[in-house]
Amino acid sequence: MDFINIEKKWQEFWWKNKSFEPKDDFNLPKKYILSMLPYPSGEIHMGHVRNYTIGDALARYYRLHHYNVLHPMGFDSFGMPAENAAIKHGIHPKTWTYENIEAMQKEFEALGFSFSKNREFATSDPDYTKFEQQFFIDLWEKGLIYRKKAMLNWCPNDKTVLANEQVIDGRCWRCDTEVIQKELYQYYLKITNYAEELLKDLETLENHWPSQVLTMQKNWIGKSSGLQFGFKIADECLKACNNIQEIEVFTTRADTIYGVTYIAIAPEHPLVEHAIKRVSQEDSKMIKAILNTTQRERALEKKGAFLGIYAIHPLTKQKIPVWVANFALANYGSGALMGVPACDERDFEFANLYHIPIKVITQSPQNLPHTKEEILKNSGEWSDLSSSVAREKIIAYFEKENLGKRVINYRLQDWGVSRQRYWGAPIPMIHCKHCGIVPETQLPVTLPEDIVIDGEGNPLEKHASWKFAQCPKCHKDALRETDTMDTFIQSSWYFLRYTTPKNQRENQAFDQNYLKYFMPVDTYIGGIEHAILHLLYARFFTKALRDLGYLHLDEPFKQLITQGMVLKDGAKMSKSKGNVVSPKEILKKYGADAVRLFILFAAPPAKELEWNDNALEGAHRFIKRLYDKANAITPTTSKPEFKEVGLNEAQKLARKKVYEALKKSHEIFNKAESAYAFNTLIASCMEALNALNAQSDEQILCEGYFVLLQILEPMIPHTAWELSERLFKRENFKPIEVDESALIEDFMTLGLTINGKRRAELKVNINASKEEIIILAKKELEKYLENASVKKEIYVPNKLVNFVTA
């Protein structure tokens, strides 16, 4: 079997005939099948192969069944690795990127992926950047982008800012370097404006997205309802506080307000700047050090200092000490919180560490802290009430007395999108001394190519002829913005661009007719690691573009498949572990179809896949057996006709196995609850081939192969096209319906029991009468009934026969 040449033959045929381009007929039923676009690193890995094999199987199935399928591919081509390659190898990022794209395209073709070439692009293409920059300006003018100075997550290795979502366990999501804090100006997208909608619309994705992803997004958005109120600064402390009148706090546990024994404020809180003069030199040094630590570092060890000032409890009028605490976050609520050590684990630990008094306000006999809902005590007029009842009454009291109000808070923060690097989409803004920040009018703003990348700072800052520009408003000298956009902006709308053919998107980001027809994406495939990065950003960007009038949908992805990682020797494949399997080498040895079949058979998409050379050999042998048995079939040039006349049991079994597999294929591809368990479908195909291998009747073989090749085409397309052309001619190879009559059993299996104890099984004709079944059952149980007296015979149709003996 010369699988290499067979695969090349069909790959050339597909590209030459543009077999995978969707039709421009908006009346056809459509499917938009999309795998997350890759970064062009130069070589695809097994994670790519798995992702794109799953997507390709879906696309080919729907195409075979007369859907108008959009199955595109592109490249997420801006980013740090290109700059790192420039430093390491002395090659321009653009050259490195586009050479890698070309290499990866060849690998995709070698795997037989049915991508639409007429939709392909790279996100670093100038005509893509042009419309992205226009979106940026539109969002700026609508007030959905702003610029401010803030303490930001900084990756010392990549020398760039990271969004909160890009810091994982205190480390850079890309290079795993420990992140530090740095104060810089930054552009922000107001994703918080959409927090409630992003949260609420998760309900529309239930049963279509993995529950784990929905939970991760829900927790990241982090909605909480509570009481916002103030502790007034004690009169004698006002001067030290530069006349700041009160400390505003937010709490979800208003019922614990009588247990407050300290107030904790973030080191970034404006009060600290003035009151820090009252602390010791050692504490002052510690507070300043906290400012330069990440949230993860702050969580490792609780630290704080008493500021020497007090605030007044709004109900008891007692003086409450004010502390700086590293666990108080400036970007959540007001940056201040009430410390209730009797009812909160964190507050309790901090109080014990610094010997702060603890006031018990619940009637629980358990050890402190009492974190569960309890009956209150020492809580004024709300004593003896449950926590939940007291909470509502206290909030109502605060609102009635104008002491505070009920508010909603979100953990979600605005998305910082400025990056201090060269290889990214330039932010299209001009800084003018006279006009302020002015949007550029000549788009796209492209990157200068005559740059030096040495790893020291942002190359655009050093490029005078590019950096110095003219203000579009007053035409005086000005400075161009040298930060580039976070690459997650590019991946937040690429799926919209795919809808439109290349020749119709030169002057528009996407065509409205194509957009309305193909969107939303029907099935989106990618790793779960993107749950609160790309997937959340893409949902937000879709809603923001909707509000700008660019589109008319709320959610971009109807259904989501998160495929598991590919492991070898129990660990994720990586060069450092020395357990990488090269797709290129495997393709040379086994061919694309064997690799695809193994990928789909080894595990369901959502599960981790353990690489297994023996299983790959097994996939290869299955394909060889498929070719071998095909030699027993006489090719036909017309569509074969199938008749079920006078078949023996083995022939009926073969037909049954084939049509069972066909029925299963429709369930696997069309029912989300099947979890796309291709492994079970392939197992059914293997059973069907085993049954066909036992046959010599050419009619049975012909029908079996006609059906089996249709089932297998999405998974092993080269083999299916080769054999269907050879045996039936492709023009005759149309989808066939499940023959339900072939699935009907002629026999049924009954359990045989004596006094309820199972003794044997009986296979009988489904048309056998009760009397016939009883006679056959007694004969089968003869040795058990030999010396027994049967008092009662019980027949439960289609299930069992039970004999009650004396």
Swiss-Prot record:
This is Leucine--tRNA ligase. Keywords: Aminoacyl-tRNA synthetase, ATP-binding, Cytoplasm, Ligase, Nucleotide-binding, Protein biosynthesis. The gene is leuS. A motif ('KMSKS' region) lies at residues 572-576. It is found in: Cytoplasm. PANTHER family: LEUCINE--TRNA LIGASE, MITOCHONDRIAL, LEUCYL-TRNA SYNTHETASE. Disulfide bonds: none annotated. It comes from Helicobacter pylori (strain J99 / ATCC 700824) (Campylobacter pylori J99). Gene3D superfamilies: 3.10.20.590, HUPs, Isoleucyl-tRNA Synthetase, Domain 1. GO terms for biological process: leucyl-tRNA aminoacylation. CDD domains: LeuRS_core. A motif ('HIGH' region) lies at residues 38-48. ATP binds at K575.
